[in-house]
């Protein structure tokens, strides 16, 4: 008898995330950068999944900024990403008060109170995944390396906190002047 596995697929502006559930438990997850080649990356991710679970049956739902068109073409259910996040958090971490989600090009805050309230940044991508990637590149590391660098900091430098472009123009001269990473 084939096992029914449930796939959640988030096709974002910079990455593809996939989670596979069996009987409500996560049995597989993956986070892959698509480097603006969404279709080929999606095919690669799904092909590797089919190789890993060749005898199983799947249900699938899509979310994310890059998923709506794909869901229409493939006739696969699409769930708006704030709703997907809200549903997962309410089920898996029901005592949560606030969720902060940093996407590749946006940032969202979801407040869980009597009513769900959601806010999203405007047109600026400062503080998003793309901004963090740019800062990591500027510092010759990756986003995990930013975590490690932050653990050993000795000085806090004044950097614009409201705009990614201004932050970058604050960081570059500091590095040129020999500021420690």
Q: Language-model features: where?
A:
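Short glycine-aspartate micro-motif
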Residues: 4-10, 59-61, 95-100
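Glycine-rich phosphate-binding loop plus the immediately following alpha-helix
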Residues: 114-155, 163
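Adenine-nucleotide phosphate-binding core of ATP-dependent small-molecule kinases
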Residues: 167-181
């Amino acid at each position: 008898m084939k096992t029914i596995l449930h796939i959640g697929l988030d096709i974002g502006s910079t990455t593809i995330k996939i989670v596979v559930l069996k009987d409500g438990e996560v049995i597989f997850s993956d986070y892959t950068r698509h480097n603006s080649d969404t279709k080929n990356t999606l095919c690669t991710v799904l092909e590797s999944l089919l190789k890993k679970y060749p005898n199983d049956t799947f249900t699938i739902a899509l979310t994310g900024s890059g998923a709506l068109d794909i869901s229409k073409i493939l006739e696969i259910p699409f769930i708006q990403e704030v709703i997907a996040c809200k549903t997962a958090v309410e089920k898996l971490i029901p005592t949560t008060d606030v969720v902060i989600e940093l996407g590749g090009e946006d940032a969202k805050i979801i407040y869980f109170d009597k009513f769900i309230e959601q806010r999203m940044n405007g047109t600026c991508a400062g503080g998003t995944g793309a901004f963090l990637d740019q800062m990591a590149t500027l510092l010759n590391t990756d986003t995990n390396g930013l975590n490690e660098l932050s653990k050993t900091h000795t000085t806090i430098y004044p950097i614009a906190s409201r705009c990614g472009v201004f932050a970058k123009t604050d960081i570059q001269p500091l590095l040129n002047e020999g500021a420690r990473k």
